Amino acid sequence: MGKYFGTDGVRGVANKELTPELAFKIGRFGGYVLTKDTNRPKVIIGRDTRVSGHMLEGALVAGLLSIGAEVMRLGVISTPGVAYLTKALDAQAGVMISASHNPVQDNGIKFFGADGFKLTDEQEAEIEALLDKEVDELPRPIGTNLGQVNDYFEGGQKYLQYIKQTVEEDFSGLHIALDCAHGATSSLAPYLFADLEADISTMGTSPNGMNINDGVGSTHPEGLAELVKEKGADIGLAFDGDGDRLIAVDEKGNIVDGDQIMYICAKYMKETGQLKHNTVVSTVMSNLGFYKALEANGITSDKTAVGDRYVMEEMKRGGYNLGGEQSGHIIMLDYITTGDGMLSALQLVNIMKVTKKPLSELASEMKKFPQLLVNVRVTDKKLALENEKIKEIIRVVEEEMNGDGRVLVRPSGTEPLIRVMAEAPTQELCNEYVHRIVDVVKAEVGAE
């Protein structure tokens, strides 16, 4: 991660950290790095429903026009929609303005290359070097060489038609409840599932610029669980603000997370001969029950650091086509180049339809291990990981677990915290293991 770019683009409080002035520079320098080998390059821009989206879009567009780019505004659309359309429309770059599942005051800018993938570390470093230069030496075209801007609000429909053809059957006879987080999928998802002849009930579909992710969406699926039970729906589907995550709810109102969705998809893909190299890529935060369920079905798992970009890197490296995170980022690389909530939802509902099994039955095959995560504020994260007494207590606990549980002790990427997580067959054991480790961490390097 650099000075400006985090694990998912540039993020910050809009108009305070992520200012229009910075957005102009990001548009100008980012656009240049991605399009410098092309005369009159095409760049597409999408945004979610945040009130700050218009402000940042205007600044980004100005920056892009100033290097001679032709800009196409897509309006409100999901992040995977931008990724798909960048490649489908032969654009040299795509830009999404969103802070995903974050609260309304935050916003972010992320780029996609001509291939529809997020930027490499090298590309981000090149943009950062230009941002830090005292003098802007990039070309300044004038007159007829300046870029122009046009709108292509039909892009959302083009994307929906693409993902719709990834399933063979319609969804007639199914009642689907949708929670769109008052975000980018608010008009897209209801149209998609109604077009597939499902009966739909909706919530979180009235964005006003201020209510994105506010008690709704994939980080707050409790309201959707109530809607599913109230309406007698077969499944609930919750997306986040920019539509790259999915959390589901079964017909009984139980929450089905990203691990369970990945397991259901992996098993089905293996049975139908679609799972490449018989492998799923996930992060170290996936539940132990996920790995055990895969193992029981003869499926291999590959673990990465936390973050969908690391999952994607491993998928590309190994030629895998299914990966994701417990949080609901699920990547189906046969179809699209980033996590996609609506695409994942289509595949999940399609599996229900084809197998004629309710979601509760499909999800119950994966037995989740009780999990506890405790954050400990420390004086020095590096010292904590090198401390011999901390290493020793971790070793002792792992020996006691004897393969029937696991411990993960890792530093926070952004705060002076050590995260201590354990999974075990019972919640009591889980609590005991975590607190034994936490006590040693606090005694050795605790900041309080």
UniProtKB/Swiss-Prot annotation:
GO terms for biological process: carbohydrate metabolic process; peptidoglycan biosynthetic process; UDP-N-acetylglucosamine biosynthetic process. Its EC number is 5.4.2.10. The gene is glmM. The active site is at 100 (phosphoserine intermediate). PROSITE patterns: PGM_PMM. Mg(2+) binds at residues 100, 240, 242, 244. Belongs to the phosphohexose mutase family. It comes from Bacillus cytotoxicus (strain DSM 22905 / CIP 110041 / 391-98 / NVH 391-98). Activated by phosphorylation. This is Phosphoglucosamine mutase. It catalyses: alpha-D-glucosamine 1-phosphate = D-glucosamine 6-phosphate. It is an enzyme of class 5 (isomerase). The modification Phosphoserine is found at residue 100.
